[in-house]
Amino acid sequence: TEKQHVKLDTELLDKYIHYQCDIRDIGQIENIFSTYSSDIKLIIHTAAQPSHDWAAKEPQTDFTINANGTLNLLEATRKFCSDAVFIFTSTNKVYGDTPNFVPLIEMDKRWEIDPKVSMMSSLHISYGTSMAGVNENMTIDKSTHSIFGVGKVASDLMVQEYGKYFGLKTGVFRGGCLTGPAHSGAELHGFLSYLVLCAVNNKPYTIFGYKGKQVRDNIHSYDLINAFNFFYENPRCGEVYNM
């Protein structure tokens, strides 16, 4: 946001350079990458169109930002700084509605994965679940992803492929409920931040499903950045991590 841009400019001075560009514009992207070339050591790709509703209304806009924009960044990395580490913030939406079919058991304050699921081999292969959570073996096939989800699947797979096919150091981090300082939450995403906003302003908060009990876990941005740093220090080609 503009507010964060001004804050970074003020606090970091000449250590921070801001470029306002559209990741769909390969010319703009290549101009930036060619300026710094092999001096670029790390790319953290967080640019995206995040709204499911907007994606359904403007599928072409959504796909060109999330899928084509990611491809532009990958190509620029391959062309100008192929030894750099490329980190992509993907989403659990690549799994579509498959997580909705994972057997859950109701606890006092939340829903947990049914322990029996890890003992059922057919479910374990399909769902990639255990009491520890959901791993990367969960299938992305035969599910309804939403228009937004399909664009993210395409970009997710492309980041993996550039790692495995071209040998780039690419890591895909599939986030779920992310939160942290200055999180601009809204009703349809960033629910924990939005819940606090409603509480502070004494506004009603609408709860959807599951009897108001928690299903998914939140992860703090501090922990996510730590995961990024671990990958940067020990990169691999085309790896995927559920966060």
Q: What do these predicted ranges mean?
A:
Residues 1-176, 222:
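N-terminal Rossmann-like NAD(P)+-binding domain of SDR-like oxidoreductases, especially those catalyzing
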Residues 34, 48, 200-201, 232-236:
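Residues at helix-coil transition
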Residues 77, 163, 199, 231-232:
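Hydrophobic pocket-lining residues that define ligand/cofactor binding sites across diverse proteins
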Residues 140, 213-214:
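Catalytic Tyr-x(3-8)-Lys segment
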Residues 153, 166, 178-194, 203, ...:
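Glycine/proline-rich active-site loop of Rossmann-fold NAD(P)-dependent oxidoreductases
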